[in-house]
Amino acid sequence: MAKLYFRYGAMNSGKSTGLLQAAFNYEERGQRVLLAKPATDTKGERDVVSRLGMTRSVDFLVGPDESVLEAFEHAAAERDEPVACLLIDEAQFLQRAQIDELLRIAVERGVPVIAYGIRTDFLTHAFTGSARLLELAHSL
């Protein structure tokens, strides 16, 4: 069974760099990955941007009222090649229902999902997406 993973850390701790490294590792083995992030994250527009200067375009953006599952299925269908992993940057900005859909992608579609983000804001209040990921993720 595929799992939902939540990789969290403080700002500037290398989460986006880790995501880009994970994508590279999958692709080096000839496996297809999809990258996504919330549309509300305006840093880099359609790119995942690491503080080391590495960038990569996402396969899809997800608005707060959009279905992650539908966006994933649409992007996955663009090529006749199975998706080995879905990588999500800035997952703290996703909504509860969208995190529930990430779990469905892992469990029902058999595609591992690795979500990267921060747990709390500067006032130590949990972000909606992070709180739900802490409840549902198979691995932290």
Question: What label would you give each PLM region?
Answer:
Residues I105-S130:
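Sensor-1/coupling segment of RecA-like P-loop NTPase cores
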Residues A22, A97-I105, G129:
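A short acidic, amphipathic alpha-helical/loop segment
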Residues D89-A91, I118:
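Walker B catalytic acidic pair
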Residues F93-Q95, F122:
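Catalytic P-loop NTPase motifs of RecA-like helicase/translocase cores
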Residues M1-A77, D121-R132:
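Conserved P-loop
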Residues S130-L140:
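A short helix-turn-beta junction within AAA+ P-loop NTPase domains corresponding to the substrate/partner-engaging
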